[in-house]
Amino acid sequence: MAASGFLLIASFMVVLFVLSRPLGGFLARLIEGEPFSALQKVEAGLWRCSGVKNAEMNGWQYALAILCFNLLGIVLLFVLLMAQGSLPLNPEHLPGMSWHLALNTAVSFVTNTNWQAYSGENTLSYLSQMAGLTVQNFLSAATGIAVAFALIRAFARHSATTLGNAWVDLVRITLYVLLPIALIIALIFVSQGVLQNLDGYLHITTLEGVQQTLPMGPVASQEAIKVLGTNGGGFFGANSAHPFENPTAFSNFVQMLAIFLIPCALCFAFGQVVGDNRQGHALIWAMSLIFIVAVVVVMYAELAGNPHLSPLGADSNSNMEGKESRFGILATSLYAVVTTAASCGAVNAMHDSFTALGGMIPLWLMQIGEVVFGGVGSGLYGMLLFVLLTVFIAGLMIGRTPEYLGKKIDVFDMKMTALAILVTPTIVLLGTALALCTEAGRAGILNPGAHGFSEVLYALSSAANNNGSAFAGLSVNTPFYNLLLAAAMFIGRFGVILPVLAIASSLVAKKRQPAGNGTLPTGGPLFIGLLIGTVLLVGALTFIPALALGPVAEHLQVWLAH
C-alpha cells in the first residue's frame, strides 16, 4: 500500500484542489449576487412566467420557501412513481410502485438521500428515472447549496435582516452551476462507455447458450448529477459497481472528484465571501486530515483482509469479496470513504462485504454528520455547526463570550446548534432500537450477531444523515423499513436545515465586532486541531457504545479467534 495507496490519495487531493479553487471563486460571485449576462434573459423569463418576485427574504421566509418547495417535490414524485405503469417511456411495461415504496423513494430523492429499497432496472421506467429521480437530483442538490448560501451571507453581512431569495438561489444554482458541470461530466461518462439511450432492453444469448437480458436506458445523464449533487442513487441496482454505470478506472476517478468538487469549492467560496480566505482554508485542512486518515485505515483493513484465509490455502488475505477487479482494493477503499464522507451514498463495491474495521469507518463518517467535505451545501453548514460548538467550548475554557468572524455567539445560537447536531444521532439510535425491538425490524436481518446489528445501525445512520448507501444484507423493502427510513430521512434533512436557517437569521442581524486580544484566531493550526477534536469527541461520545456492539465486536471476533 505504501507507494501506490499514498500516490492515489495525493493525486486525488491535488486534482480536487486544482478544480475546486476556481469553482469556489465562481460560487462566491453567485453568493454575492453578481449578475451573469450569459443566462440573464433565461432567468428573467423564468421570473415572468412564474410570477416570482426576486426581493430578498428573511430567515423564516427563506425556510418556508425551501420547506414548501421540497414538500411539493415529494408529492409530485410520489404520484409519478405510483402511476408509472400508465405513463409513456416504459418499454418494459413496469407497474407502479407500492405506496410505501413510492413514499420512501420520493422522500429519499427529495432529501438528497437516494436510499434505494429497489433495483432500478427492474422497478422504474425511463420516465420515472428522467422526469422523477434525475430532476430531484438537481433540485435536492440546489436546496442544500442554497441553505449554505444563506448561512454564508449571514456571516458576511451585519446589521441586516435578509439572507437572499430562495427562489433566485435555487434557479441560479441549477442554471449556472449544476446543469453546465453535469453536462460536461455526462459527456465524459459517455466517452468511457456509460449508456445513454432510450432503447428497450436487449435479450441475448451468451457464449454458454444462456438467455440474458441487458438493461438499457439514459444512464450517463443521471449518473453525472448523481455524483455531482452527492445524490448517490444508481440507475441500476448495483450502482457504480455496474459496468454500464461506471465502466473504467478513469470514470471511477471522475466520479470521486465530482462528489467532492462542490463541497470543497464551497469552503473556498466561504473564505472569499467573509473576507478572510484563511477561514475557508482552515475548514479544508480539518476536513482533509480526517479524510486522509480514514482512507488509510480502510485501505489497511481491506488489504489485511481475513486472517483465516491463508490457512485455507488462499493466495492472499486481502479482501476482494464484493469488489470489482477493474478498480481493485485501493480505488474501492478511496471511493467508499469519499461517498460516505460526502452525503453521496454511491457505491462501486458492496460495503456489506468489507471487513469489520473497513466497514466501520464509512459508518462512522456518516454518524459524525458527514462533515468531512460532506454533501453539496450540507457538508459546509454541518461543519460550521461544529465550528460554532468549538468556539463555544473555547470560550468556556478562557472565560470569554464566544465569537466567530466578529459575531457574538449567544444562547439562541447555541441552542439551535445543539439541536441541529443532536437530531440525527437521536434518530439513528432510537430508530435502531425500534428496529431491533420489533418483529418486523428483526425479520429483515440476514446475518445474525454483531454483523446483523451493524446492518441495522448502518441503515439508520445512512438514512438519517441523508447518505443512502447500505449494508445490503438487510431486507428493507417492507412497510416497516420503508416508513421508518422515510421518517428518518425527512427529519434528518429538515431537522438540520431549519435550525441552520434559524442560526443564519440570528447572525445576519448582529454587528461585527473588531478582533481583540482575547479573540480566538480561527484560521490557524490551533483552531484546526480544536475543530477536529470537537468532531471526534462528539462522534465518540455519541456512537462508541453502538459501534462496540457492531463492527468492533465483529472485528474482535475475527482477529481474537485467529
UniProtKB/Swiss-Prot annotation:
It holds the Pfam family KdpA. One of its GO terms (cellular component) is plasma membrane. The chain crosses the membrane at residues 6-26, 63-83, 132-152, 175-195, 253-273, 283-303, 327-347, 356-376, 379-399, 416-436, 483-503, 526-546. Keywords: Cell inner membrane, Cell membrane, Ion transport, Membrane, Potassium, Potassium transport, Transmembrane, Transmembrane helix, Transport. It is a multi-pass membrane protein. It is found in: Cell inner membrane. One of its GO terms (molecular function) is P-type potassium transmembrane transporter activity. InterPro entries: KdpA. Its main location: membrane. Belongs to the KdpA family. The system is composed of three essential subunits: KdpA, KdpB and KdpC. Part of the high-affinity ATP-driven potassium transport (or Kdp) system, which catalyzes the hydrolysis of ATP coupled with the electrogenic transport of potassium into the cytoplasm. This subunit binds the periplasmic potassium ions and delivers the ions to the membrane domain of KdpB through an intramembrane tunnel. This is Potassium-transporting ATPase potassium-binding subunit. It comes from Yersinia pseudotuberculosis serotype O:1b (strain IP 31758).
